[in-house]
């Protein structure tokens, strides 16, 4: 048995001993995904954090995801195995900046992408993910919407509403790098393959896609599509799930440079050590958590 398998067995034993739940994002390393109780997108993981039984949640993702789990499951211990796994986009808007934006646009609703800090969620009216951004925006009674922090997701949602969407100027370092040239090269290499991209991509890339969806939406599309070849425009970690769950389908990365270094920081050693030590533990101050919980709860209630 190799070192990876030994570590995985040790983690599974510790998980049972500690009554822990292991959640992993679709962008995590394959060997981490393989031992998770659930691998999914941000919306699926948020719902799981709120509903799953257990004393401890080990969140294999980045910091804002673990914060969201701590907000939704205040009675559980939430661990983030790689303490330095952050999301640069989440740092592109602060609570203070959002308060100023509200003052500049009185009467506008604030929709925050889940890729934000707890403090920003606390200043927002409702949260969204890439899977439900359109329905969240359309659920609001206000006719103007401040959308933070991802400009690309905000502009994508604006295509499907009559509301005036005011997007922030944030972006995902991975998805914003895709260009129309990347699409052209991939289609030349794989003629006939459907192009499926994440809504965090630039508008000019989205315009060239056959389908646009969240990570789990991409998986469902590949599973149900009659086609057999797909060009996947999101972080390459999703290819592991696609290879396991879509037998007979061939999936190619839109760019092999689409790697989120922060999502890859979590290793099996980190997971094992977190279960042994009960650290690093993620907590959110009650005053912020209660306000952020309202914004997340409104999303989950849709």
From Swiss-Prot:
Its localization reads:
Cytoplasm
- Keyword Chaperone tagged: no
Q: Which residues form a coiled coil?
A: none
Please give the superkingdom of this protein's source. Archaea
Enzyme class per UniProt: transferase
Its EC number(s): 2.5.1.72
Pathway listed:
Cofactor biosynthesis; NAD(+) biosynthesis; quinolinate from iminoaspartate: step 1/1
The cofactor remark states: Binds 1 [4Fe-4S] cluster per subunit.
Q: Tell me the residue numbers annotated for binding [4Fe-4S] cluster.
A: 87, 172, 260
Catalysed reactions, as listed in the record: iminosuccinate + dihydroxyacetone phosphate = quinolinate + phosphate + 2 H2O + H(+)
Question: Which keywords label this protein?
Answer: 4Fe-4S, Cytoplasm, Iron, Iron-sulfur, Metal-binding, Pyridine nucleotide biosynthesis, Transferase
Cofactor names from the entry are: [4Fe-4S] cluster
Q: One GO term of the cellular component aspect?
A: cytoplasm
A GO MF label:
metal ion binding
One GO biological process term is: 'de novo' NAD biosynthetic process from L-aspartate
Primary location recorded for the protein, binned into one broad class? cytoplasm
Residues noted as binding iminosuccinate in the record, renumbered to the chain: 25, 42, 113-115, 130, 198-200, 215
The family note in this entry says: Belongs to the quinolinate synthase family. Type 2 subfamily.
Name the job this protein performs: Catalyzes the condensation of iminoaspartate with dihydroxyacetone phosphate to form quinolinate.
Q: What is the name of the protein in this document?
A: Quinolinate synthase
Q: What is the originating organism of this protein?
A: Methanoregula boonei (strain DSM 21154 / JCM 14090 / 6A8)
Organism lineage reads as:
Archaea, Methanobacteriati, Methanobacteriota, Stenosarchaea group, Methanomicrobia
């Amino acid at each position: 048995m190799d070192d990876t398998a030994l570590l995985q067995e040790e983690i599974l034993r510790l998980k049972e001993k500690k009554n822990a739940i292991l959640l992993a994002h679709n962008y995590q390393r394959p060997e981490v995904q393989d031992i998770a109780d659930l691998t999914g997108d941000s919306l699926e993981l948020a719902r799981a954090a709120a509903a799953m039984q257990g004393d401890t949640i080990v969140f294999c993702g980045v910091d804002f995801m673990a914060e969201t789990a701590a907000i939704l499951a205040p009675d559980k211990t939430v661990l983030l195995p790689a303490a330095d796994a952050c999301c640069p986009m989440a740092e592109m808007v602060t609570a203070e900046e959002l308060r100023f934006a509200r003052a500049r646009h009185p009467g506008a609703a604030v929709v925050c992408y889940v890729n934000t800090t707890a403090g920003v969620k606390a200043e927002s009216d409702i949260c969204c993910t890439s899977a439900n951004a359109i329905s969240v925006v359309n659920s609001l009674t206000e006719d103007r919407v401040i959308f933070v922090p991802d400009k690309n997701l905000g502009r994508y949602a604006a295509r499907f509403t009559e509301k005036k969407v005011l997007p922030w100027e944030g972006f995902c370092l991975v998805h914003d790098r895709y260009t129309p040239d990347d699409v052209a090269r991939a289609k030349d290499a794989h003629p006939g393959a459907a192009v499926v991209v994440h809504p965090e991509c630039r508008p000019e890339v989205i315009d060239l896609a056959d389908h646009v969806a969240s990570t789990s939406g991409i998986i469902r599309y590949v599973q149900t599509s009659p086609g057999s070849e797909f060009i996947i425009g999101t972080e390459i970690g999703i290819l592991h799930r696609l290879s396991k769950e879509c037998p007979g389908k061939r999936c190619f990365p839109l760019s092999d440079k689409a790697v989120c270094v922060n999502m890859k920081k979590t290793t099996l050693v980190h997971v094992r050590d977190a279960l042994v030590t009960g650290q690093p533990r993620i907590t959110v101050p009650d005053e912020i958590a209660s306000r952020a919980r309202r914004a997340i709860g409104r999303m989950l209630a849709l």
